[in-house]
Regions:
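C-terminal alpha-helical "lid/dimerization" subdomain adjacent to the S-adenosyl-L-methionine
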Residues: 274, 289-345
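N-terminal chloroplast transit peptides
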Residues: 1-30
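A short acidic, Gly/Pro-enriched loop at the edge of an enzyme's catalytic core
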Residues: 247-259
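A short SAM/SAH-binding and catalytic strip from SAM-dependent methyltransferases
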Residues: 257-271
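Conserved alpha-helix/loop element of class I SAM-dependent methyltransferases that forms part
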Residues: 141-189, 203
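Class I SAM-dependent methyltransferase SAM/SAH-binding core
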Residues: 184-248, 275
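A short glycine-rich, Lys/Arg-flanked "PGG" loop and its adjoining helix->strand segment in the class I
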Residues: 274-286
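N-terminal auxiliary segments of SAM/dcSAM-dependent transferases
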Residues: 35-146
């Protein structure tokens, strides 16, 4: 399989002209830095293994073959766990600790039994047959999130160092954008949509300690893990957790100064991404900031992934092609956002920020 994909990758996909960007494209700036961690753009607008290219169609055909897909799913999971543990992320130990805790008591307290899940959310996802609606997915979410930082900064000597770079650059991009474009609007209320088990929400709460933060997610399993961890922290303003659909939160309009979506959009079909951006616009006050951080289509690292790795990744990410094909910045403009800026905040990820006009 790897040989077939390698040949397809060499001969197919998008051509490599000097510059494919249209005149009105968003200029993507890289975070300044030296050494191998400095973000670099690839030669293409998006990876050749995504979208409607011959290589992408070949990968899609392989994934659609169910016996092979089952093997890919198992292989992908094994690769992720093994790689994490080689990076000193105690994946199995962290998972066991959650599953053997009293987190189950939190579930009924936080779950909205009347919530209707969107159809795309009920599909197998990330090698879990139940998608994000399972205890195993919730228990493994934090080590999986830690792995994101280590994969982005492989030369980091520790997970802590990798997180300092990945999360630090992300938070700095948010703060710099808000200071420049908010018109002196203070960040008093924060919403983290698709908060998972609360990792990004906690970073935001620590960056802006005087603000009130809300973490919102479709998975009551993830939220139960997030709430259990938050209860053990002594925070001036404890994070509030909400079980709701990020496209229709039910929260009041004009009630937040910052809305964040961290590593959410690549997990959604294009229609849901548009819905999330529209809801964020409704929720933000004039001068408020939206910040979306996720895989960058222009990332040199992602564009140059090996055939085996990008095939395994696509086998557990059903909406990856839609994400890469969507012009996120233009979608934000069409919704009404201004000052749309995209920056590579690490070698794999971009942070896209924008403002609600006054």
């Amino acid at each position: 399989m790897a040989a077939i994909l390698a040949r397809a990758g060499a001969g197919g996909g998008l051509p490599r002209p000097a510059d494919r960007r249209p005149r009105n494209a968003v200029v993507v700036a890289a975070v300044t830095g030296a050494g191998p961690a400095a973000p670099q753009e690839g030669a293409l607008e998006r990876p050749a293994w995504s979208g409607e290219t011959p290589l992408s169609r070949l990968v899609g055909a392989l994934i659609a073959f169910k016996p092979l897909y089952s093997l890919m799913k198992l292989a992908s999971r094994e690769v992720i766990i093994r790689t994490a543990e080689k990076s000193n992320i105690p994946w199995r130990e962290m998972t066991k600790k959650v599953l053997e805790s009293d987190v189950y008591e939190m579930f009924e307290r936080i779950r909205d039994p009347n919530l209707v899940y969107p159809d795309y959310y009920l599909n197998p996802f990330h090698a879990y047959d139940e998608g994000n609606l399972s205890w195993l997915a919730a228990a493994e979410a934090e080590p999986a999130t830690m792995s994101i930082a280590k994969r982005a900064i492989p030369e980091a000597t520790s997970i802590e160092e990798a997180n300092q770079i990945v999360r630090g650059n992300w938070l700095n991009a948010i703060e710099e954008h808000h200071l420049k474009y908010s018109g002196n609007c203070q960040i008093n209320d924060i919403l983290d949509i698709g908060c998972s088990v609360g990792v990004s929400a906690r970073y935001l709460a620590e960056k802006f300690p005087s603000a009130k933060a809300v973490g919102l997610d479709l998975s009551p399993y993830f939220l139960a893990v997030a709430a259990q961890k938050e209860e053990k922290l002594s925070r001036q303003n404890p994070i509030r957790w909400v079980h709701a659909n990020g496209e229709a939160t039910g929260l009041p309009s004009d009630s937040f100064d910052l809305v964040s979506l961290a590593y959410v959009c690549h997990e959604c079909p294009a229609r849901a991404i548009t819905g999330l951006v529209k809801e964020a616009f409704r929720l933000l006050r004039p001068g408020g900031t939206i910040a979306l951080t996720d895989n960058s289509p222009k990332s040199k690292v992602l564009q140059e992934l090996s055939p085996v790795l990008f095939t395994l990744m696509k086998s557990t990410e059903p909406f990856l092609d839609e994400y890469y094909m969507l012009n996120l910045e233009e979608t934000m403009r069409q919704v009404g956002f201004v000052n749309v800026h995209s920056i590579l905040t690490d070698p794999r990820h971009r942070t896209v920020t924008a403002t609600v006009p006054y």
